């Protein structure tokens, strides 16, 4: 009878120990599942950050390419404007030279006109005095009159050319003003592009990458890409490590579940043994 009591006592202790162990295993399983859920959440967060980093990388790359394209277009426009201004300046110089030549020609024509007028007056006096002389003298008068008419026509043409030169000069001044306006607009566009590049740099800083000089030089852009690539690789490494941790924890959970199942079976066996012992005692 004492042996049975001792056996019952030992079985009771084993059952209590098994129950305590089962509770501990259940708690450990819960803790492990909590850690697993946390790691899975961190893994998902890393996946989101990885996706965001890739998207940010593509966005930054596109923004930098677009900024470089705009800057190149602005430089081409400025070069074209400078070429246009140079052409207008050359045209203005030619017009000024043409104007000077026209003015000289006008002065010369005016002098000739005065001389022709004087000659005509002199011829008129001579004609009155020498009237009746040979027809050759009259022809000379006609010739002088023709020369006078020619001189007047030359003076008129010179006036027209002077007016035309003045008109071209005015047009050139208007074109020059327009070119200056276009140049100012190009300068404003360059400033606008520089502001856009500054905004791009600020956006890149908010993405926690070192790309604050991406708008200035290509080597800074390449350095930023290297930083983004490194961050991407770090994120991939962290994601890989998280996957390994999840697999490891899953194995630990499976092992604990197996141990818990074994302890439950052991507990059931002890309970069955106790029930059988109680039944035997009751039979006595």
Curated annotation (Swiss-Prot):
Q: Which UniProt keywords apply?
A: Allergen, Coiled coil, Muscle protein, Repeat
Instruction: Name residues in a coiled coil.
Output: 1-273
Q: Does the keyword Cell inner membrane apply?
A: no
Alphabetically, the GO molecular function entries are:
protein homodimerization activity
UniProt cross-references to PROSITE patterns, sorted A to Z: TROPOMYOSIN
- Gene Ontology biological-process annotations: regulation of muscle contraction
- Record keywords: Coiled coil included? yes
Basic and acidic residues bias: start-end ranges: 102-131
**Protein family per UniProt:** Belongs to the tropomyosin family.
* Quaternary context: Homodimer.
Q: Which PANTHER family match?
A: TROPOMYOSIN (PTHR19269)
Q: What is known of its domains?
A: The molecule is in a coiled coil structure that is formed by 2 polypeptide chains. The sequence exhibits a prominent seven-residues periodicity.
Q: What does this protein do?
A: Tropomyosin, in association with the troponin complex, plays a central role in the calcium dependent regulation of muscle contraction.
Q: What is this protein called?
A: Tropomyosin
Q: Which organism is it from?
A: Mimachlamys nobilis
Lineage per the UniProt record: Eukaryota, Metazoa, Spiralia, Lophotrochozoa, Mollusca
